[in-house]
Amino acid sequence: MSLSEYLREFAEIFEEAAQELTSIFELPPDLLKDITEEDVGTDDSCNKKFLEVQKQKEDEEDEEILKGVDLTQQDSVREKIHEIQSMSQLSEKRKALLMQKMLMSGYLKYRRTHKKESDENQLSSSDLEKTYYDKEQEILGCSHYMRNCKVQCFDCHEWYTCRHCHNDACDHVLERPAVENMLCMICSKVQPAAQYCKYCKNCMGRYYCNKCKLWDDDPNKSSYHCDDCGICRIGRGLGDDYFHCKTCGLCLPISVFNTHRCIERSTDCNCPICGEYMFNSRERVIFLSCSHPLHQRCHEEYIRTNYRCPTCYKTIINVNSLFRILDMEIERQPMPYPYNTWISTIRCNDCNSRCDTKYHFLGHKCNSCHSYNTCISSIYKPLDHPQVSIPRLATAEDAGMRRLMGHSWDNSDEDFNIFGIHSFI
């Protein structure tokens, strides 16, 4: 007999007994109603207790059946599954629940242990240990921020001074908007995230953003939150020294409000040099004259050996002096026969024009803008007649420039309209 059938039969017997008692003693209707309601409540309580006892009994039986299985050994697990399947006294539903409980026993044990530790709010010695931005001057924080608190990751519940410290140590990313708790490093008290500690009343950071859960106690840094970007950035604020460009999808200096060229979601990509995602990077991002972004640190290293944008190959620094040297070198070193009869069809990376020019090992000059930043499309050889197509000749057009990269040049950023932005803080 199933449990539901048993309870149904029990209720019918109880109802018959109540009718007999009513007919014998002829109780008043209102009194009978009160007694019936009280009996129903008692019956529900008994049923609940009965179910709890029944579940406890089943759990004990399950533990006895699953005793001895080693989840790390496939043979042991397979043997136990066959044993459960062969138990004719168990229903198919009970067998399925048993196998599920066996396979999830390790996870359930971890959850119970983790929940217990979380409920007791136990903090390890490493959690309570203070971290410093500058240990000599006793400025609390980490290598990334000045702050007086630690944050708890919503996913792993571990404590770190900032999201960067967490991301460097863990295999997942800390989502700052999801942070709920902070640990004051002054009084070592856990509490909801806020700018001030509710126990010692100390300020956790001069700047605090409740949306990003960002604390920064650096007195020399100004920060603001941009709702369109969805993050905090370095600066005095929108309308003061920055504006948000809807097309580019980021905040730009007000000085380039009327001059910058819009590229949709321009920083929603990785840096072409180091590969780091630029939209929320802490590194300063600059925009080249062609409006392509990259990290300022990467740009400074890159232009030591290259003069072209890594994305579109346009010239990004002033190399006019090198072009003049190339003019003199090409004039001084004429090509020998039969190379002096060859004609190159070139495409200019700076002005995108196509033209024909004399072939030379050192480089090919654009007839429109006089730039040597060109690439060969094809070469016409009068002695052979057929025109040999070269989809991409990676060395010929740069041979002369590589020889001259050791020379100095005027790399003034003003001539090439390079400007920078402070990104995610």
Swiss-Prot record:
SUPFAM superfamilies: CHY zinc finger-like (SSF161219), RING/U-box (SSF57850), Zinc hairpin stack (SSF161245). One of its GO terms (cellular component) is nucleus. Keywords: Metal-binding, Zinc, Zinc-finger. Zn(2+) 6 binds at C245, C248, H260, C262. A zinc finger (CHY-type) spans 135-202. Gene3D superfamilies: 2.20.28.10, Zinc/RING finger domain, C3HC4 (zinc finger) (3.30.40.10). InterPro entries: RCHY1_zinc-ribbon (IPR039512), Znf_CHY (IPR008913), Znf_CHY_sf (IPR037274), Znf_CTCHY (IPR017921), Znf_CTCHY_sf (IPR037275), Znf_RING (IPR001841), Znf_RING/FYVE/PHD (IPR013083). One of its GO terms (biological process) is ubiquitin-dependent protein catabolic process. This is Uncharacterized RING finger protein C2F3.16.
